[in-house]
From Swiss-Prot:
PANTHER family per the UniProt record, alphabetical: DYNAMIN, INTERFERON-INDUCED GTP-BINDING PROTEIN MX-RELATED
Induction of the gene: By interferons.
Region annotation (G1 motif) ranges: 40-47
G5 motif: region residues: 242-245
Protein family membership: Belongs to the TRAFAC class dynamin-like GTPase superfamily. Dynamin/Fzo/YdjA family.
GO cellular component: cytoplasm; microtubule; nucleus; plasma membrane; presynapse
Listed PROSITE patterns: G_DYNAMIN_1 (PS00410), G_DYNAMIN_2 (PS51718), GED (PS51388)
Boundaries of every GED domain copy: 540-626
Annotated positions binding GTP: 40-47, 141-145, 210-213
Pfam families hit by this protein: Dynamin_M, Dynamin_N, GED
Record keywords: Cytoplasm, GTP-binding, Nucleotide-binding
Biological source species: Epinephelus coioides
Protein name: Interferon-induced GTP-binding protein Mx
Localization in the cell: Cytoplasm
Length: 626
């Protein structure tokens, strides 16, 4: 094989080793790594290309041969050094003694992971080959695309395979190596269509043409045009190779002999010799190009990879903090652990009611919801006042006729005033109680959410806290409702300080005079100042003025008092009682084991997070050292 210059070789292996190390750590479970994925339709010659690159025989045959993603790690050794192979899957590793063992070992691994037969699996098989005859390169071979299910295959096998391929090639970190036979119409190949769907500009797609010896006479120039990027444009371009056919395999033509035969084929071909001269033909040239592409791709991806690892680390550490370290086994330490948990929760409950930051890290803010509810209450009072003002203008005359006694015209009937004010205030009582219940539900949900965040993994603690929250909500809501109804009973006593009422009355009179002056003009204003009308209409106008003035005072009082009652009972008192009851619960030490019984799967979640944290920290160390 053609060798790369010494300076480049010094850069190639470390780059590829870095990504291989990250993949072997399992980092790909957390984020996508730079890779070259090999895809092609069934019988596209995909396996032959990989055999030619790796120097080992891979599973062959009709139907689906590659049934699991195969990570093919090739490491170039110095001349004279021995061949080395290793296969790894599902945590087990097997060293291979001879290249001839590879095919059977892959079949065994596939049977173990995907079942005996023709099913497929998403699990990765890793095959490492070290030899003087391979390039420094890592590829991921994916199952060939099946169009129709054959005997023994699931009906949706084609859909399953496409789904598996899409999961790899959709990632921006993946270069798609699309294998297409020369003797088919390239535009109809499913593999190229799939690559174009996720990479429409061909930024990360490289085409490989196979089987050039099988093209029909007269179509050779079309093949040359495809390789020259003149038919379907790909920014990474095309290569063309000729690998061993079934006849040569049957005749036991070695891979080395096949490479010599390939070289002669392109060099001497009437049409394809130009591709050979331009460095776009033969497996060795393909190996060089793929190595170059992978290294450049890795170098471009490293800054983003570092950022992703840092983000994942931060996210994982935050999740681990939420899960905690789990309860200790010692009884005394276990009690302290429970006390810490409960104390942190109750302190957060108090903080929630005062609008301060929470220790659990949640961004719960009940005040924004309360502010909206109280603003709606204020708007309801204003709207009720506007409707009341419009209504009394129509109804005050009826009331005057009904309740007026022996007074002469011009005297205001206090009974009419009192009846109308009380009736309006009564209409505000039920909306206030409704607002209380809505806010009670909001606060209850916030406390329950806080319990879930504070007691992650401890279902009995959550259940106990929820029961207390529900009971306290009912109790405090009942107390608050009683206070509200008492407030409305008091509001039926028509009262305010004389000065307050006089000021409100003067303000209202001035507003109405200004409105009337604007409506009727300055002449009317002058007439009004010197003429004192003492007819029935004037009396009614005066009565309306008094009613509107008093309602304004009462509504302002309710706008503040109702929210104060709700906040005091549903937030302040609820949080204080929750704190008392949760701390009182700690007195029952016999209940401690029940409360600290962990969720059955929490241990595995914590172990999974710890494992992720460990591999991400190792990954970060690899990147720092690189």
């Amino acid at each position: 094989m053609n060798t790369l210059n010494q300076q480049y070789e010094e850069k190639v292996r470390p780059c590829i080793d870095l990504i291989d190390s990250l993949r072997s750590l399992g980092v790909e479970k957390d984020l996508a790594l730079p890779a070259i994925a090999v895809i092609g339709d069934q019988s596209s010659g995909k396996s032959s290309v990989l055999e030619a690159l790796s120097g080992v025989a891979l599973p062959r045959g009709s139907g689906i041969v590659t049934r699991c993603p195969l990570e093919l790690k090739m490491k170039r050794k110095k001349e004279g050094e021995e061949w080395y192979g290793k296969i790894s899957y599902r945590g087990c590793e097997k060293e291979l003694e001879d290249p001839s063992d590879v095919e059977n070992k892959i079949r065994e691994a596939q049977d173990e992971m995907a079942g005996v037969g023709v099913g497929i699996s998403d699990d990765l098989i890793s095959l490492e080959i070290a030899s003087p005859d391979v390039p420094d390169l890592t590829l991921i071979d994916l199952p060939g695309i099946a169009r129709v299910a054959v005997k023994g295959q699931p009906e949706d096998i084609g859909k399953q395979i496409k789904g598996l391929i899409q999961r790899f090639i959709t990632r921006q970190e993946t270069i798609s190596l699309v294998v297409v036979p020369c003797n088919v119409d390239i535009a109809t190949t499913e593999a190229l269509k799939m690559a174009q769907e996720v990479d429409p500009d061909g930024e990360r797609t490289l085409g490989i043409l196979t089987k050039p010896d099988l093209v029909d006479k007269g179509t050779e120039e079309t093949v040359v045009e495809i390789v020259h990027n003149e038919v379907i444009h790909l920014k990474k371009g095309y290569m063309i190779v000729r690998c061993r056919g079934q006849k040569e395999i049957t005749e036991k033509v070695s891979l080395t002999e096949a490479l010599e035969s390939e070289k002669a084929f392109f060099r001497d071909h009437v049409h394809f010799h130009t591709l050979y001269n331009e460095g776009q033909a033969t497996v060795p040239k393909l190996a060089e190009k793929l190595t170059l592409e992978l290294v450049h791709h890795i170098e471009r991806s490293l800054p983003r990879l570092e950022e992703q690892i840092e983000d994942k680390l931060e996210q994982t550490q935050a999740e681990l903090e939420r899960y905690g370290s789990g309860p200790p086994s010692d009884a005394t330490e276990k009690l302290f652990f429970l006390i810490d948990k409960v104390t942190a929760f109750t302190q957060d409950a108090i903080s929630l009611t005062t609008g301060e930051d929470l220790k659990c890290g949640d961004k719960l803010n009940v005040f924004s919801a309360l502010r909206r509810e109280f603003a709606r209450w204020n708007a309801h009072l204003d709207l009720s006042g506007e409707k009341f003002n419009k209504r009394i203008e129509k109804e005050v005359e009826n009331y005057e006729e009904k309740y007026r006694g022996r007074e002469l015209p011009g005297f205001i009937n206090y009974k009419t005033f009192e009846v109308m004010v009380k009736e309006q205030i009564k209409q505000l009582e039920e909306p206030a109680v409704k607002r209380l219940k809505e806010i009670g539900d909001t606060v209850r949900k916030a406390f329950i959410q806080l319990a879930h965040s504070s007691f992650i993994g401890f279902p009995n603690l959550i259940k106990t806290a929820k029961a207390k929250i529900e009971a306290i909500k009912q109790e405090k809501e009942s107390t608050a409702e009683s206070m509200l109804r008492t407030q409305f009973k008091m509001e039926l006593i028509v009262y305010t300080q004389d000065r307050t009422y006089s000021n409100s009355l003067s303000d209202r009179k001035r507003e109405e005079d200004e409105e009337e002056d604007t409506r009727k003009g300055p002449v009317f204003a002058k007439q009004r100042s010197i003429v004192y009308r003492m007819d029935n209409h004037a009396t009614l106008q005066e009565l309306m003025l008094h009613i509107k003035s008093y309602y304004k005072i009462a509504s302002q009082r309710l706008a503040d008092q109702i929210p104060l009652v709700i906040r005091y009972q549903m937030l302040q008192e609820s949080a204080a009682q929750l704190q008392r009851e949760m701390l009182q619960m700690l007195q029952d030490k016999e209940n401690m084991d029940f409360l600290l019984k962990e969720d059955c799967d929490i241990g595995s979640k914590r172990a999974g997070l710890q494992s992720r944290l460990k591999r991400l920290m190792k990954a970060r160390a690899y990147l720092v050292e690189f």
